Amino acid sequence: MKKIMVEYIWIDGNQPTAKLRSKTKVVDHEVKSHLDLPDWGFDGSSTRQAEGHFSDCLLKPMRIIKDPIRGGDNLLVMCEVFNSDGSVHKSNKRAKLRELAEKFKDEECWFSIEQELSLIHI
């Protein structure tokens, strides 16, 4: 099997404006889904997501996208950040969104346009 470069991408803890971070892992197996990729740790103190004395954070793959720069079978991996114990990290806003999306998945979305007109006699 040929080797594939997977770029793990996540949102850091910078305030007031978070930034994107990434690091690359090389795998030698086929990746069809984000579930085919392992969780990966990182030092949260360098991304303002943890204190220096207990800085382990965890990246969990959530989506894969074909890498438009490297091409081939290489992938971009969109990740969420978790604490080392597996709990949701405070910088992980997407986890709450997933929870709400699951809760309301059977609801229908409706969108409409309201057009207002004014007639003025001059």
Task: Describe every region a protein language model picked out.
Residues 1-120:
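ATP/Mg2+-dependent ligation/transfer catalytic cores
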